C-alpha cells in the first residue's frame, strides 16, 4: 500500500495552496486532532486530485453535492475551486441547478448564496 509522509506543516501547506489561507476549521485540528487532519488531507487529495476526473469536474460535482445538502459554505469552497480549475460561471451555476431534481428547488437558494459569496471576493 502507498506510504504517505504527512506532518502538520505538510498539511498546512496543502490547505494554504488550495485556499490561499488556512481555514479556521482546519486550525482546530492542527494541535488537537493531528491524525484526523492527516486523514482529511489524504481524503481530499485522493478525491480532488488522484482520480480519473479532471479537477474542474470534481469541483463542479462537489458543488452539486453540497447544494443538494443545502450547504452554501461548501458550495462556495468548491465553486472557488472550480473557478481556479477553469470553470465558467455558467458551468458553476449549472452544477448547482443539477441538485434540484434530487433535493428540490430549495437547494437553489443556499447554492446560489455559495456561488455569489465567491464572486464577491
Regions found by a protein language model. Give the residues of each.
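Residues at alpha-helix boundaries and short interhelical turns
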Residues: 30, 51, 69-72, 86, ...
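Non-catalytic, well-ordered alpha-helical scaffold segments
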Residues: 23, 58-62, 90-97
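Acidic, glycine/proline-rich low-complexity segments that act as flexible tails and inter-domain linkers
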Residues: 1-57, 84, 110-121
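Residues within well-ordered alpha-helical secondary structure of globular protein domains
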Residues: 42, 64-66, 98-101
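C-terminal binding/interaction regions
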Residues: 87-121
Amino acid at each position: 500500500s502507498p506510504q504517505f509522509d504527512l506532518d502538520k506543516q505538510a498539511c498546512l501547506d496543502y490547505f494554504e495552496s488550495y485556499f490561499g489561507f488556512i481555514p479556521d476549521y482546519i486550525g482546530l485540528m492542527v494541535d488537537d486532532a493531528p491524525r484526523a487532519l492527516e486523514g482529511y488531507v489524504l481524503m481530499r487529495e485522493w478525491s480532488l486530485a488522484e482520480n480519473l476526473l479532471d479537477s474542474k469536474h470534481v469541483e463542479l460535482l462537489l458543488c452539486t453535492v453540497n447544494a443538494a445538502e443545502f450547504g452554501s459554505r461548501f458550495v462556495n469552497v468548491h465553486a472557488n475551486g472550480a473557478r481556479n480549475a477553469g470553470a465558467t460561471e455558467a458551468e458553476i451555476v449549472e452544477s448547482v441547478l443539477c441538485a434540484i431534481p434530487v433535493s428540490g428547488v430549495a437547494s437553489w437558494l443556499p447554492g446560489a448564496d455559495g456561488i455569489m459569496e465567491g464572486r464577491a471576493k
